C-alpha cells in the first residue's frame, strides 16, 4: 500500500509539474504599425525584417513562449500623425513614427531639425543623438509619463536634399516657390523666402503632380521610393543633414504585462535595431542617389557658397527654438547644446556656429 501511495503522489507531482510547464508557455500576438509603408520608408523595412523578425525568433529560441506580429504599415491602422496616440491607446502595441509629425507633443524631440546642416552621415547623426538621449533621460521618460509608451530605439532619415520641378542655382531662385515638407523642417524654407507647405510623403506625389507645390525637402531614398522624380526631376544635393527623428516605441502596459524574459528580448532587439539604422541608412543614401539617377532624375550638387549662405540665413533659428522650448518648461538649451557638442565629437564641422543664447 505504501508503494502504491508513493507512486500516486509521484504521479500527481509529475502531472502538476507538466501542467505548470504548459501553463507558463504563453503565446502573444502583437500589433506593430507605422503610417509609412514598408519599402519606400527604410525604417519601416527594418521594423519588419529585423525588429519583428528578431523578437519572434529570439523568444522562440530562448524562452518557452511564442510571439507573432500582425504588421500594419502604410497607415492601415494608424497614419503618420496618429502613431504616437495609437500606441498610447493600445490600438497598436508597437509603433514606428517620425517625431516630425508631433511638433507640439514632442516639440523638443525634434531638436535635430532645429540645427540644420548637422552630421551628413546617418551613422554620425544617430551616434550624436544617442549621446543626447543618454545625457538627457527626460527625452525618454516623458514618453512613459505622458504618452504611456516605452522608447525602444532611434531611427534616422538619411541626409536631406531638395527636389524641384525646375532647376535652380541660387537661394534667390527659390523666393516665392512653394515647397513641401514635414513640420519642423519647414522653417529651412521660410528663412530663404520660399513658401513652405506642410505635407506628408503619402500625399506628395499627387500634390507635386497637380501643382499644390513644386518641390519637396526629402532624402533620396524616399524621394525615389515615392517616385517624386517623375513630377519633380531636379534633385539638388544641399546637405541639410541626416535627421535622427524616428522613434520605435511599445505600449507601456503591454510591455509590463509580459514575462520578464520577453520584455528583456524586446528591449535588447530595440537597442540593436537602433544600432543597425545608422550604417544601413548610409547605404540607403548612396543606393537612393544611384536609383534616382537610374530613374532619370537630374542630380547636381549646390555650390559651397550657396550652401553657406543658406546656413547663415538659419543662424537665428536654433536660438528661437531653444527659447521656445524653455518657455514651455522644456530643457531646450541643454538638449540642443548637447547635440551641437555631440556632433562635433563624431567629427562634424558646422558651417555656421549656432549661438543658442
Outline where the language-model segments fall.
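N-terminal signal peptide c-region/cleavage motif recognized by signal peptidases
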Residues: 20-22
